[in-house]
Amino acid sequence: MHQPDYRDSSGIIQMPWVFLHAIKDYYDMPWMMARHDGLKATFNITAPLIQQLKLYYNAPEESDKFLALWLKNPSLLEEEDRKWVIKLCKSTQFDTMVKPFERYSELYYEEHLNNLELIDLEVLFILSWCGEYLRRDNEVIKALIDKKRDYSYDDKSLLLEELSRFVSGIFSYYAKLHNSGVITISTTPLNHPILPLLMDMQNAIKANINTAIPKDYIKLEDDALLQVTRAKDLFHDTFGFEAEGFWPAEGAVDEKSVELLKSCGIKWIATDEEILFKSLNSKDRKNLYTQYNYNDLCIGFRDHYLSDLIGFTYRHQDSGSASRHFMGELEKIQQENPDASLFVILDGENAWEFFQNNGFDFFNALYSDLSSCSWCKTMRMDEITKLPREDLLSLAPGSWINGSFNTWVGHSEKTRAWELLFLTKRDCKHHHSELDEDTKSKIQDHFLAAECSDWFWWYGDDHFTEFGAEFDELFRMHLIDIYDLIGITAPADLFVPIIKDRSAGNFWLKPQSDISPVINGKHDSFFKWIGCGVVDESKLFSTMDRQRGPIQKINYGQDNEKIYFAFKGKIKEMCSASSIIIIIDPINVKGKLSFETKKTFLGNLEVDTACGDWFEIAVDKNKIDKDEISIRFELEKDGNIIQILPGFGELKIDLSRDYSQNWFV
């Protein structure tokens, strides 16, 4: 469970994600598991999340910019504030969170809202973020959901008051489950930094030799130590006991950072399977199914495939079927490795908004199956440390994203952010002797906050958010505030945005006109796909990441007769897959297509395919009696889903083909 520090120099939280995930995920995740007998798990809670969540205990509107504006009467909002509130209220996943509320769906696409409509939008936005526990057990939330529309200012006040009371009990609930032996709680270095990069930027090159790192970088080993010790202190102050385990931010490790953790009393950590495979110079998965001892520290290595099944693949599937599939995958491993330890490690908050009912149905099915299973039991990480371990002689540097650090360093924007951080460090050092202890302490706080991995995550073109400008400003403001504390003028470069102007158009271009390409698998004409829509899979990852599949770009479009698709990417790897599954709703078509040139019938739906320079599909429209359809694809290899397309969920196609909204004049 993690959120970066969204506070500005005045201490006001600039983005509402801590509060929103608190009412949706932070209580729900342990609660859903604790409903089932005999299950155990480990929950990781980061320091910035702890610090900010505590600010919502009393009068949350005084600590959160969004909630302060949200609570206002809409008639009192300045125009820019009004636009920002509406933007946030429309930032929710439509199919799983907006669509279940009829009134929310009505308002979602309205461009102009009167004051009463805005109150409805605001209330329904917060209600859509309420998790299953609140929807089932809280009378205030249930009554407001039942009201459906025509909310009042008093409803807003009541809602915020009730949710403030609710979030104030979250950490005590974790402590209760910990004390009863149901869960173990771990934490992460203070501001979620990539410790190996703080220790030595050369780790980025060791993990991937092609990585460009900043020139004249500084080793920030003292900061790395503070990130660890301060996290431990805050954890103890919050929960009343010592943190014995750490999830290094983003599973990022190297030998020196792990030695640092051990020296601070940490007994176990977890990271990704890619680190193990690189450390052993072997990809034999049997090596994954145990715990390891490295320098007297216990390490569990995350099973990427099993974890991604839950985090990504199952979101579109029937809950019972998904649970049975997962148990089947566990059983395959158990039959070959009866004493195997499996480490399933997940993003605790960002996946569930893509599931129906915030993942409740899926987890209820899975936890029921696990609770009644005789050959598999769940364990806490502190229990794992008591089991026999395999010795690991060396530890390769890397993270849980492709075993490298390229998500946080390498791109020109990421490099620029690091350079500004190092510049500020050098300027601060020149004036350090002139500063009193209180000022030094405040400056150190800003440096530790600026080292958060999240800022670097959003720089570059590998992840997208509509709030990139806000993240960029928060990062630079930490450095500007340092110059203000020193008493000197901040460099002009700090007032220039690092992040380039980006929008969803960078990864998703909608069709501009009809197309009628010949389906032959060949890149034989520049004009073949002119006017098509494009989904760039390489650029659409957001708050979560996974191993990226072979398909990197999708072209799509239609004419009077057919809907066309072209899949580009690593064609050999793509065609080595067993099949591509096509799912079309609401006409309930689902079928497998092979990577060859042929005609296939899915029921009465005729589908042409061709494989060559890329893979192409044409779907006959004549049997589709709908104005709009939703299509997604699943790339299957050896019975496993290795990629879901498009990565943002499903492609909605308007069969009426009104392109006017996509034209630029």
Question: Model-derived features: where do they sit?
Answer:
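Active-site and substrate-binding clefts of carbohydrate-active enzymes
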Residues: 1-146, 280-513
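Acidic (Asp/Glu)-rich catalytic clusters
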Residues: 34-36, 172-187, 262, 293, ...
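Short, solvent-exposed turn/loop segments enriched in Gly/Ser/Thr/Pro and often Arg
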Residues: 44-49, 189-192, 245-253, 382-385
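Acidic/polar low-complexity flexible segments
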Residues: 509-514, 583-598, 622-665
